[in-house]
């Protein structure tokens, strides 16, 4: 977080970005919350949130155990930090706040949305493997994700028709 991520934050601020997205695996392995690396990461995310809204996507569970990212919205900052820990959509609103969909997607484009993000955090392949077998898990995940993504077509089309950009975010492994 000190050098690489810090440089990225410096560049985002210097270039005047409107928002920042971190698509998972903020660290290369799981860290204890009291570790110095988590403190550095938190300071950099806070510095970024002082500049623009921040969206963080849940990464690989071995790097970011579930719940790890929950501390980041609590850091404060001029702008909010939203953590997408589940499949769903979130809109960046005109006032710079985040508005998450109540379900897995929006039913209508939120009034005042600047952009709509479809968030696909990491999929627990072990759970899928337990249901379909290890040999078939990767293909099963692919089929389910394809079906899921097609379910977003309607709302994304409505957003584009309203000239609201749509952005797909994912964290995972591509097979095939």
Regions of interest found by a model, annotated:
Residues 1-95:
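Core catalytic region of metal-dependent phosphoesterases/phosphodiesterases
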Residues 67-176:
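Conserved catalytic scaffold of divalent metal-dependent phosphoesterases
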